[in-house]
């Protein structure tokens, strides 16, 4: 067999023509110091702020401090396997999380990885966790109500879709319960809910997940958890991961509710990272950009304009106070960023007023525009009644003789407090809330003993379900009060059947 030189040279030519040389350039640095979840690396000259880097053992890190001759990296995972002299390489990617419908009903960590043991999450899309908030022209003023199902909130401090309402109070005053009840009440309301647990106990998160599952709320909820046992960087990233997952739905024209439970723990985690990165401390040892940490997160809550699809993202951030001190650093920061706050007081909680909302210190700066007309009409005098009652209550303690008007105010106030009490995980539809508050503000409860008010309410709702459906339907569909004469007749008819306890 003869070797044909032309054929061989043609083949070699073809191979040379088809040869593509691809040189992969990757920035590689060396770990020069490691400890407390922070690594310092030398040689990553072109790394971006917030870029993901990969250590030789596969653990990821995030470049936060870009200094003259080294880079400060926070490690997103166990750091015990990393040692001085190890290689660390750039990925060229900014921190991203998976987003999409597949996350609904799942419990994930701040990196979007499932922690509920239900197998992998099939998502095809990711979004960077740091993204700019919608601009002025992309927004619309808040005008649609977000019904929490809690009488004290829907009547006194209403929340609108796209609002940021701070829930503030000491530990164990029922902050998480308010959020869970609000999520449960979003059933059939076309809302996606995201519950972000920051630095909570694993057992607490488990209880929340089971409560949501029991009430069928997990079908439209994503739970993001960075528990107390996880590294500080994950606690710092958790709220951003939650809002990023929510933005995916908001930009598709859907409505989202994000609960951050709680931002004081995120601030503490960020303080820890900053001090370990040797950034200069400020007031209460927090770094100088602690305000920006929360403002850039909460500014991403918005009601989008119709041109942008009309979606909304409502934020319910929590802040834990120490001994009711709302003038501390983090509480005042977050109060100034949000559109109002709901202040929960431990004194009220322990005296049996639950939800323990202090009506005097709680406000909603934009929610009034979102309240339905019927509720606005009936709850107009409620806040003043409560404020007057709290003021007079102190005088009444002295037991001196009080005139008729003062006695009437005290009696109305005591009944108002009773009406605003509510059981746990029992949200009430807005039309029923309007009915009982109408009865209260129009004097129908003035002759009912205070201890019977809760029973009156329960039986009144049952009676309305059977005999007053047309009234409830009218409020539900028109958002207006029904004919006053018909409403009064219905309440009088029920009062005739109600038996006062002896």
Swiss-Prot record:
SUPFAM superfamilies with a match to the protein in the record: C-terminal domain of alpha and beta subunits of F1 ATP synthase, N-terminal domain of alpha and beta subunits of F1 ATP synthase, P-loop containing nucleoside triphosphate hydrolases
Enzyme Commission identifier(s): 7.1.2.2
Topology relative to the membrane: Peripheral membrane protein
The reaction(s) this protein catalyses: ATP + H2O + 4 H(+)(in) = ADP + phosphate + 5 H(+)(out)
Chain segments carrying region Disordered: 115-138
PROSITE patterns: ATPASE_ALPHA_BETA
Assigned GO CC terms: plasma membrane; proton-transporting ATP synthase complex
Enzyme class: translocase
Site (Required for activity): 362
GO molecular function: ADP binding; ATP binding; proton-transporting ATP synthase activity, rotational mechanism
Keywords: ATP synthesis, ATP-binding, Cell membrane, CF(1), Hydrogen ion transport, Ion transport, Membrane, Nucleotide-binding, Translocase, Transport
Cross-referenced InterPro entries: ATP_synth_asu-like_sf, ATP_synth_asu_C, ATP_synth_asu_C_sf, ATP_synth_F1_a_nt-bd_dom, ATP_synth_F1_asu, ATPase_a/bsu_AS, ATPase_F1/V1/A1_a/bsu_N, ATPase_F1/V1/A1_a/bsu_N_sf
Binding-site residues, ATP: 169-176
Location(s) in or outside the cell: Cell membrane
Keyword Iron annotated: no
Database matches in Pfam families: ATP-synt_ab (PF00006), ATP-synt_ab_C (PF00306), ATP-synt_ab_N (PF02874)
The protein's role, per its UniProt record: Produces ATP from ADP in the presence of a proton gradient across the membrane. The alpha chain is a regulatory subunit.
NCBIfam families in UniProt: atpA, PRK13343.1
Family designation: Belongs to the ATPase alpha/beta chains family.
Oligomeric form and interacting partners: F-type ATPases have 2 components, CF(1) - the catalytic core - and CF(0) - the membrane proton channel. CF(1) has five subunits: alpha(3), beta(3), gamma(1), delta(1), epsilon(1). CF(0) has three main subunits: a(1), b(2) and c(9-12). The alpha and beta chains form an alternating ring which encloses part of the gamma chain. CF(1) is attached to CF(0) by a central stalk formed by the gamma and epsilon chains, while a peripheral stalk is formed by the delta and b chains.
Alphabetical list of PANTHER family matching this protein: ATP SYNTHASE SUBUNIT ALPHA, MITOCHONDRIAL
Name by which UniProt lists this protein: ATP synthase subunit alpha
Native species: Geobacillus sp. (strain WCH70)
Gene symbol of the encoding locus: atpA
């Amino acid at each position: 067999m003869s070797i044909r030189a032309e054929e061989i040279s043609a083949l070699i030519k073809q191979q040379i023509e088809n040869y593509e040389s691809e040189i992969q350039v990757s920035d590689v640095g060396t770990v020069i110091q490691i400890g407390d979840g922070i690594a310092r690396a030398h040689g990553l000259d072109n790394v971006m702020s917030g870029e993901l880097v990969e250590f030789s053992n596969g653990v990821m890190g995030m470049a936060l401090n870009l200094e003259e001759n080294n880079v400060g990296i926070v490690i997103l995972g166990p750091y015990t396997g990393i040692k001085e002299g190890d290689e660390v390489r750039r990925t060229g990617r900014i921190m991203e999380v998976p987003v999409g419908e597949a996350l609904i009903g799942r419990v994930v960590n701040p990196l979007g990885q499932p922690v509920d043991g239900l197998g992998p999450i099939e998502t095809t899309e990711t979004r960077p966790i740091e993204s700019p908030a919608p601009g002025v022209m992309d927004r619309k003023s808040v005008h649609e109500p977000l019904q929490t199902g809690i009488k004290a909130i829907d009547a006194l401090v209403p929340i609108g879709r796209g609002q940021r309402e701070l829930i503030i109070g000491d530990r164990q005053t029922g902050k998480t319960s308010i959020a869970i009840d609000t999520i449960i009440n979003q059933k059939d309301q076309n809302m996606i809910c995201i519950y972000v647990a920051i630095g909570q106990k694993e057992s607490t998160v488990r209880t929340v997940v089971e409560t949501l599952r029991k009430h069928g709320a997990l079908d439209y909820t994503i739970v993001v958890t960075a528990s107390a046992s996880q590294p500080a960087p994950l606690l710092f990233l958790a709220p951003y991961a939650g809002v990023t997952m929510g933005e995916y739905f908001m930009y598709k024209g859907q409505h989202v509710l994000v609960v951050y439970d709680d931002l004081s723990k995120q601030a503490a985690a960020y303080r820890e990272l900053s001090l370990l990165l040797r950034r200069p401390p400020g007031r209460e040892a927090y770094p100088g950009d602690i305000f920006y940490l929360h403002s850039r997160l909460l500014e991403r809550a918005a009601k989008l304009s119709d041109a942008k699809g009309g979606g909304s993202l409502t934020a319910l951030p929590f802040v834990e106070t120490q001994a009711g001190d709302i003038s501390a650093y983090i509480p005042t920061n977050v109060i100034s960023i949000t559109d109002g706050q709901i202040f929960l007081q431990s004194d009220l909680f322990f005296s049996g007023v639950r939800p323990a909302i202090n009506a005097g210190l709680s406000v909603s700066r934009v929610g009034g525009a979102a309240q339905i007309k019927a509720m606005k009409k009936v709850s107009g005098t409620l806040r003043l009644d409560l404020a007057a009652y709290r003021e007079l209550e102190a005088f009444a303690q002295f037991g001196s003789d009080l005139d008729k008007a003062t006695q009437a105010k005290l009696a109305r106030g005591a009944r108002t407090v009773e009406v605003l009490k509510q059981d746990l995980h029992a949200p009430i539809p807005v039309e029923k809330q309007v009915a009982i508050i109408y009865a209260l503000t129009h004097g129908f409860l003035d002759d009912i003993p205070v201890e019977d008010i809760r029973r009156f309410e329960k039986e009144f709702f049952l009676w309305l379900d059977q005999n007053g459906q047309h009234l409830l339907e009218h409020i539900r569909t028109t958002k207006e009060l029904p004919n006053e004469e018909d409403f009064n007749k219905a309440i009088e008819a029920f009062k005739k059947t109600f038996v006062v306890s002896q």
